[in-house]
Amino acid sequence: MKVLINVFLLLSLLSMKVVAQDTGTPSVFKTDIATYLTAMNQEQWDTVIDMMYPKFFTLGSKEQLRQSFAQVTEMGMKVTTQLNAVEKISPVVLTSNEQFHKIDYRATVKVKMSGIMLENKEQMKKQLQSIYGDKQVKYNAPKHEFIIANAKKSMLAIAPTYSNLWKYLDLNAQQEQVLLRIISKEVLLQLH
């Protein structure tokens, strides 16, 4: 009987610890997303890469991603994103060794263009409208800048099971086929 009581107490303590971790998660996610976006805005690529889900780099190296970021900047496109609010955090989806959350948030996105990119502003406008909707995308001609004031965005937060060491991936419809190469379809379906 004493063993049974000890097991019950241990299980109770463990469940309380899990609840305590879950209550801190929204603030962790908000802070992490703000940090990630700030690093992107300031072109701190090492910080961005360190915050990304490691399995992403089975598709291409960290150096290739750094070069892609730099190339976009060199071509004349500067994207800044300001977190407005975290709107929704999905219930956790567990696998045998990882946990996943989908985080929906709102942000102000600005896409400033110059050089080669400025020559293709109509194509960029169509691409942004296909992502955010026609009415959301505004163009500030004097600044050569597209503005999406209240963009709906999503990110995946992934950590080892029973850990708060979260890593992140931007989530958008254009990348779904890529995501399926590193995250199971079952997990993605549960997160939608």
Language model segments and positions:
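Bacterial Sec-dependent N-terminal signal peptides
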Residues: 1-24
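Short acidic-aromatic low-complexity motifs
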Residues: 34-49
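Exposed beta-sheet edge and beta->alpha loop/turn motif
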Residues: 93-192
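Generic anion/oxyanion-binding catalytic loop in active/binding sites
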Residues: 9, 37, 54
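Generic surface-pattern signal
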Residues: 38-42, 70-78, 133, 188, ...
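Short solvent-exposed beta->alpha transition segments
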Residues: 30, 46-100, 113
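Short, low-complexity N-terminal intrinsically disordered segments enriched in polar/charged residues
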Residues: 18-38
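Generic detector of short, locally flexible boundary/turn motifs and exposed helical patches
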Residues: 22, 30-31, 64-71, 120-124, ...
